[in-house]
Amino acid sequence: RNEIWIIPTVGCVNDIAKKMVRDNQDLVKGTIDGLYTFPHPFGCSQTGADHAQTRKLLAALVRHPNAAAVLVLGLGCENLTHEQFLEELGDYDHDRVKFLTCQEVDDEFEAGRKLLEECSAYAAQFEREPIPVSELVVGMKCGGSDGLSGITANPTVGRFSDMMAARGGSTVLTEVPEMFGAEGFLMNRCVNKEVFDKAVNMINGFKNYFISHHEVVYDNPSPGNKQGGITTLEDKSCGCVQKGGTAPIMDVIGYGDPVVTKGLNMLYGPGNDLVSATAMTAAGAHMILFTTGRGTPFGAPAPTLKLATNSQLAERKKGWIDFVAGPIADGETIDDAAKRLLQLVIEVAGGKQTKAEEKGFREISIFKDGVVL
């Protein structure tokens, strides 16, 4: 995508950012695909790891390849200071990234308009051009899963992931708590001992996260999962890991870290749909494949394709679903379904909007662990 993003560094300026988006739609012209902002409640009153994670995640979004230009919007008195954000962001293109601190100007909307005009002029110079599939980074997610998730849609995504790896592309698998009980299927495919050790540490680290909060993992699966036919955590996990296909795991990356290795990557993140999809976007995913048996409307900042595990859902929720894996239950091969999916991914990479994009459904959620001041 060739978009302009407004990234609030603190929740206090969310409404300012949203008004800027409403008031400046005339700047979306030429090859620019849209002007968007991603509100969140954080950036202040956070300590320790939470503060660091918010800073890291927002800086990663600023670097996202779908954002041709970015306005970073702050208040001025928040914990996440301008200086801290610059330190986290590192070297950046001053033509591409602009900063505005609302307390430092008389009229933040007038000042914001001027900066967004500069963003628009910068973004408008880019034109769509052909690139190989090997340049794509695709996130893989499941949510609202049902009994067919591990039979139709998830194996299709897994086969797609293998096809991407064979073509030199990159895929990202997360939802660590939904690997519990089936993690061996993944760890046995780590490309070397270093990656294996990172995978073990990631899995054990998330288990310790549950233990530190005196929580058990068996609150998963959700009521909707059970209504859809999933009975146990292991049942759900065996379906979840199907999205990883059979290719070697080339790297394991932390929350907020970028994908730097071609092939299949594992990413530290929870099962929660919004949090994990945001983490995959921050890792650099150009788009996200989201399998679902129950249905969900949400979209991440990156184009989010909904893959229905069953044909009934696709028929009932036409406004949500981009791809139907249900025909597999009637005899279509997973190979054929994966080829259909690859073609759709290429079309979306080429500019075709997902159902969530058509409706303007885009949001983020940041991983939180500690106290709020």
Question: What are these model-derived regions, one by one?
Answer:
Residues 1-287, 294-373:
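Metallocofactor- and cofactor-centric catalytic cores in central/energy metabolism, strongly enriched
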